[in-house]
């Protein structure tokens, strides 16, 4: 059951809303939370019932581990809490590792050793990458003393809440629980329903009208790419088409998740904020899958960087040696993990490593500029200021770099990725493949790029209503040329109704799975 399906929009969602608010009115918020948790499990089971025991195990195990870790903290036994945390992490990561990476590891080992050993095909449980990271964050926060006093009902809802269960955002316990404990939780608020519906409608339109349309052009280009004839035009058409498909697909999902949660009176953290407007790779990663990057920064990068920086300082390292120890090593480790988190394949390994190199180049450039400005200040000269056209140049360079990594992200093999990438670099010539950009695809690409560059994103349209937990962090930043904000007046209602109507009409072409469901 997909968010972009008739059975969800006209069946499951209304039933879940009615059951939730009716239970809250007559039996109270705690009972309403139980009902919403059960609805979330039904939603999850609709895809593949056999995955439900894995999700339930993850919920029960991590709740119990969280309880004993928190108890150890209360008894002032930090070593005990740390040991319990290690046990919890080993179990969670072992579960993820078996289901997601066992086939990949065995296939590569047998290829190297020449063994004929085969492993039965392991089906990846839906959303295991997302809910595993969410549970890991909960356990680590419990060990750090950030989380305490967890109840089974509220944890069950936190761990299964269907709007964010399948593809994020990866939420922190501290972001959701205060809302579940609020006196207004499960109390019907027409404001939340309307705001949530508008956000959901915008996200649905991004998915059904734009992303799924682009998929019809992107998929044939990437099918057996290594066996096709490529040139510069065809290569960049494939890169741009998939890049915009992925952008609108994930942007649409992120909007729908926030909108659905808001209908139930819950605000989720922002997970997507116009990343293609970024003028650097570092800024891009601040805007793309924001909660995943937050997780990696807090639970991977910093635990590597802090001891590496201490080690560097103790040995008096400076210059490139200090940079390598304190920044390069943590960055490479973090982005390598980010790559393989997305998928078990060499294309994802390369995706992570290339992005690590991009980020390190960006860091070196920023540090170099800071050094120049420090020297200019000492010489009593005005510091270098980034001009408008320089920003445009950075933006174009960022998009150019992303074109290659998006190919890695989409290609089914390294050979396919290389076939397209070498064409994008001009190695296969210009016009040699006899490829001509279809007029309709050209118009769709131009219109989509105009929407991305010129129009406000959903958070900016709904800025007045604080659509996300952390929306205030981005308020007033990076205003687009054609700014418009939604209001609950006649124009606003007509806009929302028209967007929802068009989005639903486009569902009739077929219901495509969200791209991030594959991770």
Over which residues does each language-model region extend?
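Membrane-embedded transmembrane alpha-helical bundles that form the catalytic cores
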Residues: 1-518
